[in-house]
C-alpha cells in the first residue's frame, strides 16, 4: 500500500445478477423467460442485450419479436413487445410490456387455455363490465403490473394477452 493509495478510486464490482426462480413473484420487477432462465426488468433497454429474436421497424413503432417463450409456470406462447416511437423517452427502447396476439380460427380455445392457466397460477380475475356482448376482458394485478387477457369478436375472434407495467 503506497502513500497515495488512499486517493485512488476503488473499483466497484458489478452486482451479480439474481435470476428469480418463480415467474409469478418476479412479475412485480420484470418478466422471466423460464426455459432460458432469462429475466428482463421492466423499463430496461431492450437493445442492451439483444435477446429478442427479430426486430421490425414500422413508421410509428418498433416491434421486437421474442419468439416462443415459457412464462408464469409453464405458459408457452409467442411473445412480442411494441415500442411506440412517440411514447419512448429518448433513443432508449424500454421494456414496458410483452404481449401475445392471435386472430387464428382457434382464438376462443387459446383464450380459454390461457385463462385457465392464469386462474390456476394467479387466482381469480377481475372482469371488465364495459365490453360488447360476446367480448371478454379479464385483468389481474401484481403490484404495479397489469396482466390483461381479452377476447374480441369483430369480423373474427381475436385473443390478446398482455403483461406490463405501463399497460
Question: Which residues fall in each region the model found?
Answer:
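Short helix/turn-capping signatures at newly exposed starts of structured segments
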Residues: 2-136, 154-167
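Short, exposed beta-strand-loop hairpins at the edges of beta-sheets
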Residues: 147-155
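Active-site beta-strand termini and strand-to-loop segments that position acidic
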Residues: 139-144
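Short Gly/Pro-enriched loop/turn and capping motifs at secondary-structure junctions
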Residues: 105, 145-146
Amino acid at each position: 500500500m503506497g502513500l497515495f493509495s488512499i486517493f485512488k478510486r476503488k473499483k466497484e464490482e458489478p452486482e451479480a445478477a439474481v435470476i428469480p426462480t418463480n415467474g409469478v413473484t418476479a412479475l412485480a420487477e420484470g418478466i422471466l423467460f423460464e426455459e432460458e432462465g432469462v429475466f428482463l426488468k421492466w423499463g430496461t433497454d431492450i437493445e442492451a442485450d439483444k435477446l429478442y429474436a427479430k426486430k421490425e421497424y414500422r413508421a410509428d413503432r418498433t416491434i421486437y419479436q421474442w419468439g416462443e417463450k415459457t412464462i408464469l409456470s409453464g405458459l408457452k406462447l409467442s411473445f412480442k413487445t411494441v415500442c411506440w416511437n412517440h411514447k419512448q423517452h429518448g433513443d432508449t427502447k424500454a421494456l414496458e410490456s410483452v404481449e401475445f396476439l392471435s386472430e387464428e380460427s382457434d382464438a376462443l380455445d387459446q383464450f380459454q387455455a390461457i385463462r385457465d392457466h392464469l386462474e390456476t397460477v394467479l387466482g381469480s380475475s377481475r372482469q371488465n363490465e364495459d365490453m360488447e356482448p360476446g367480448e371478454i376482458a379479464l385483468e389481474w394485478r401484481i403490484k404495479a403490473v397489469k396482466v390483461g387477457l381479452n377476447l374480441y369478436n369483430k369480423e373474427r375472434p381475436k385473443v390478446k394477452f398482455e403483461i406490463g407495467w405501463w399497460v
